[in-house]
Regions:
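Bacterial Sec-dependent N-terminal signal peptides
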Residues: 1-27
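Preference for extracellular/luminal or secreted protein segments
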Residues: 20-58, 62-74, 287, 307-401
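Active-site mouth loops of central-metabolism enzymes
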Residues: 57-66, 133-145, 227-241, 301-305
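Short, acidic/polar
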Residues: 64-77, 143-154, 239-246, 307-312
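Active-site-adjacent structural elements in enzyme catalytic domains
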Residues: 91-108, 139-159, 345, 350-355, ...
Length: 401
């Protein structure tokens, strides 16, 4: 794993923010032969249903209680899901639960974090870095890269492989109830440069960055947690304003993108959320923008998507690789199995996505999984280097504000 991380760091040291590479660097850092051998060896042990389950990441409680452990045991041993997203709690509980869940899983789990400005967005006993809107005032992008590396190191210490960050939404609508301080600002150029620097910092230490909320949640007046927001703009406006930060991110060789739940009639007039729309996810993101990394939906329990039914199946059909937190995972798995039997989706399509997920698990070091060391965990997460970085970020941001 140390060799992989060293290679990643070398890649990003040699590549500027304007690089036009499309293939994600995380995969390029791996020994291709060794990776494919591990992927094939794991894949061959999986039943058709278990291959589908690798495409689900489920949100779980971050509370280390006997009752929650029983719930997690059923989820992992019966449904054999591919990954977890812990909700808010403490670092100690999450570390203990991660070790417990990994010990139960047939295939090592992908552990994800919704940490737009670091662990403290979800974990109470960790350093609290400035929110993105404040970081947008930092002129030196190399400091944002350093910040990304720091968050990445903390993620690695916590056994976290994927961070659902950075936010690439442009804060262009003062009536937007959900983006606001989560955005790096109102300037397209500034949002792109800050977010990409942060993302490169994350990936330089082997943590996948997942930019969101494609194709752009900044200019809406509704919250996709509660409804399906309308984005009323023309294709020309979207391609000139909302899309460029994502295009720059893709061209920089970064690995993950999250598709939001948005109603965008200019592209898809069927009132279908972008996360469930083949036109937006497959045709625009994959075919037009040439994104070859891992595609996650936003959480499928959100009101912007949940009312459409069979959300995991629809998400996979639309072109996503990972269905994030659909309701009733067992029913979702069976729905996809039925769709294969009915010819709505092929087993080959599922197998290709399963292998894609396994390749990233290999890059994360899960071929040689080791439990989180809980001794000195809180001290390590609150090391003096992070406090010094925090002061530097606040100082540079406040100087400009």
């Amino acid at each position: 794993m140390k060799k992989i991380i060293a290679c990643i760091g070398t890649f990003f040291a040699l590549v500027t923010l304007s690089t036009q590479a499309k293939n994600p660097y995380l995969l390029q850092t791996a020994d291709r032969s060794a990776m494919e051998h591990w992927v094939d060896s794991v894949f061959e042990t999986l039943s058709p249903k278990e291959r589908i389950a690798q495409l689900l990441v489920i949100t779980v409680r971050n509370s280390d209680t006997p009752q929650n452990r029983k719930t997690l045991q059923r989820l992992i041993q019966e449904q054999k899901i591919g990954g977890l997203l812990f909700d808010s709690g403490t670092a100690k509980d999450q570390a203990n639960l991660t070790n417990y869940c990994q010990s139960l899983s047939k295939v090592p789990l992908m552990i994800t974090l919704d940490g737009e400005w670091g662990l403290a967005m979800r974990l109470s006993d960790t350093p609290r870095f400035p929110v993105n809107m404040m970081l947008g005032a930092v002129q030196n992008d190399s400091l944002l890269y350093e910040y990304g590396r720091a968050v990445g190191k903390q993620c690695r210490r916590m056994g976290i492989h994927v961070n659902f960050a950075p936010v690439l939404d442009i804060n262009s609508n003062p009536r937007n109830p959900v983006i606001g301080k989560r955005s790096f600002g109102e300037s397209l150029k500034n949002v792109s440069s800050k977010a990409i620097a942060y993302a490169k910092g994350l990936e330089s230490v082997g943590v996948m960055a997942v930019a969101k909320h494609f194709p752009g949640h900044g200019d809406t007046s509704e919250d996709s947690h509660k409804t399906l927001p309308l984005v009323p703009h023309s294709k020309e406006r979207l391609m000139s304003t909302e899309i460029p930060p994502f295009k720059a991110y893709i061209d920089s060789g970064l690995s993950g993108i999250m598709v939001g739940h948005l109603n965008i009639p200019a592209w898809d007039a069927t009132n279908t959320p972008s996360s469930l729309s083949p036109i937006i996810t497959r045709e625009l993101l994959c075919d037009s923008l040439n994104f070859e990394g891992l595609i996650f939906t936003d959480a499928l329990k959100m009101k912007g998507a949940s009312k459409f039914g069979n959300t995991a199946l629809r998400a996979i059909l639309a072109g996503n690789d990972i269905a994030l937190n659909p309701s009733k995972p067992e029913e979702q798995l069976n729905s996809i199995l039925s769709a294969i039997e009915q010819g709505k989706i092929t087993q080959q399509a599922i197998d290709e996505k399963c292998k894609k997920v396994l390749r990233y698990k290999y890059v994360f070091g899960l071929a040689n999984y080791t439990p989180i060391k809980t001794k000195n965990l809180i001290e390590d997460l609150n090391a003096p280097e992070y406090d010094a970085l925090n002061r530097k970020l606040n100082s540079e941001a406040m100087t400009l504000l």
